[in-house]
């Protein structure tokens, strides 16, 4: 008999904003969350939440939980804030992807799923802006 292990696929969703990085690993359908971690869960100070180091630690934490539950391969979906917010992922996106790759996962595809408006979107605050 061959000693090949069974490959179980999952989705890793990385939401990287300017304020935090959230990593969620789900099964392939997306119906069940297998593990979840964020930059705020692994560092003490609030100012360190968006840092690349916090994203790396959060990705390692989520990866270890997913490995324990049997996930061995992932598709990565990266998302920025989108809409009227930033359309480029925050500083934690790249280190999170790198940490998931180094954790030993087989990586299928990496895609950007940031919601982009096709015309424009009205910013909050109304016509005269936010009055402070």
Curated annotation (Swiss-Prot):
- The superkingdom of the source organism is Archaea
Q: Which GO terms describe its cellular component?
A: ribonucleoprotein complex; ribosome
Q: Which GO terms describe its molecular function?
A: rRNA binding; structural constituent of ribosome
Q: Give the UniProt keywords, A-Z.
A: Ribonucleoprotein, Ribosomal protein, RNA-binding, rRNA-binding
* Entry-linked PROSITE patterns: RIBOSOMAL_S11
The protein's name is Small ribosomal subunit protein uS11
Q: How does it assemble?
A: Part of the 30S ribosomal subunit.
InterPro entries per UniProt? Ribosomal_uS11 (IPR001971), Ribosomal_uS11_archaeal (IPR019961), Ribosomal_uS11_CS (IPR018102), Ribosomal_uS11_sf (IPR036967)
Q: Which family does it belong to?
A: Belongs to the universal ribosomal protein uS11 family.
Which Pfam families is this protein grouped with? Ribosomal_S11
Q: Lineage of the native species?
A: Archaea, Thermoproteota, Thermoprotei, Sulfolobales, Sulfolobaceae
Write out the function statement from the record: Located on the platform of the 30S subunit.
Question: Origin organism of this chain?
Answer: Sulfolobus acidocaldarius (strain ATCC 33909 / DSM 639 / JCM 8929 / NBRC 15157 / NCIMB 11770)
**One GO BP annotation here?**
translation
Q: Which HAMAP family match?
A: Ribosomal_uS11 (MF_01310)
């Amino acid at each position: 008999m061959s000693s090949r292990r069974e490959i179980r696929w999952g989705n890793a969703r990385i939401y990287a904003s300017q304020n935090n990085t959230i990593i969620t690993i789900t099964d392939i359908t997306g119906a069940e969350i297998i593990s979840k971690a964020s930059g705020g869960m692994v560092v003490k100070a609030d100012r360190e939440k968006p840092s690349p180091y916090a994203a790396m630690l959060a990705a390692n934490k989520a990866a270890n939980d997913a490995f324990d539950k049997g996930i061995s391969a992932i598709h990565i979906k990266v998302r920025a804030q989108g809409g009227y917010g930033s359309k480029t992922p925050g500083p934690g996106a790249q280190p999170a992807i790198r940490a998931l790759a180094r954790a030993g996962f087989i990586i299928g595809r990496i895609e950007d799923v940031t919601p982009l408006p096709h015309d424009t979107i009205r910013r909050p605050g109304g016509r005269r802006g936010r009055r402070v």
